Amino acid sequence: MIVPFGHVLLLAGALFGLGVFCAVARRNLIMIVLGVEIMLNAASIAFIGAAARWQSMEGQAFVLFILAVAATEVSIGLAIIVYAFRRTGSFDPAAYNLMKAGDAMQSFERRGPQ
């Protein structure tokens, strides 16, 4: 039995909406990264469904590209999260001012040029 294309798009849209909610409504960096991953998987489902609908291989090629991007995003994102957690002790994004220019300049002024 073949699943209708509309059902595949409905599933992909529901997953994408869940991912957006998870990424926007949560106050935890790990949940934000998880939401982005859910959105990427929803896009993959839509591409696979479209490829099956029109019997083309471009959908599978896009999914391989999405998987590579997702793996890279997870590895870099988790490395940044681990670094930020070690520095602040919190997963709350509001606690992170790591890229604030004023702090870097004050630190430079205290130490002086090297």
Swiss-Prot record:
Main location: membrane
Membrane-spanning ranges: 1-21, 29-49, 62-82
Superkingdom of the organism of origin: Bacteria
Species, as recorded: Syntrophobacter fumaroxidans (strain DSM 10017 / MPOB)
GO MF annotation: an example: NADH:ubiquinone reductase (non-electrogenic) activity
E.C. number(s) listed in UniProt: 7.1.1.-
Name of this chain's protein: NADH-quinone oxidoreductase subunit K 2
A Pfam family the protein falls into: Oxidored_q2
Localization, UniProt: Cell inner membrane
Name of the gene encoding the protein in the UniProt record: nuoK2
Family: Belongs to the complex I subunit 4L family.
Keywords, in A-Z order: Cell inner membrane, Cell membrane, Membrane, NAD, Quinone, Translocase, Transmembrane, Transmembrane helix, Transport, Ubiquinone
